[in-house]
Amino acid sequence: MQKIWRNEAVNGTKIDAWPTTIGGPPILIGSWAGKTWIPRAATEFDGWIASGARSTFDKLKEGIANYRAHGGKRAIVTNIKVDLDAPTGDMPDDGPFNLCCDLKTAQERFRRIVDLGYDEAIFVVPDHKTETLDRVLAITGK
């Protein structure tokens, strides 16, 4: 697809892309802290998407270090579960990463992700009520 979007021939056939589509959309690769896809996301694609749902803080740290070491530019962590009404407990670095805790702790945990170098975060929220979304936004300090 990337070759087609650049108006290059693929298997001996050239399809002229419309001028407004040349270059195509950004392509981001989603993977855990893998040895294959993270370097490819950094060198061949427009970004990498890590999953907070099935990762530990240690794995998120390992993945972003690998991605940046290969020259990766845009890194997103997605599926970060948020529940600001959940009891606040310890979250060991080798345990599942989440923001299921009080607001202050969620802000601290989120800051750790930002400090690792992730450019964007996508949260999974319990509902889409204005009050909930305002509280979630407070995690980011915006």
Give the residues covered by each predicted segment.
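Active-site-adjacent structural elements that line small-molecule/cofactor binding pockets in enzymes
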Residues: 1-142
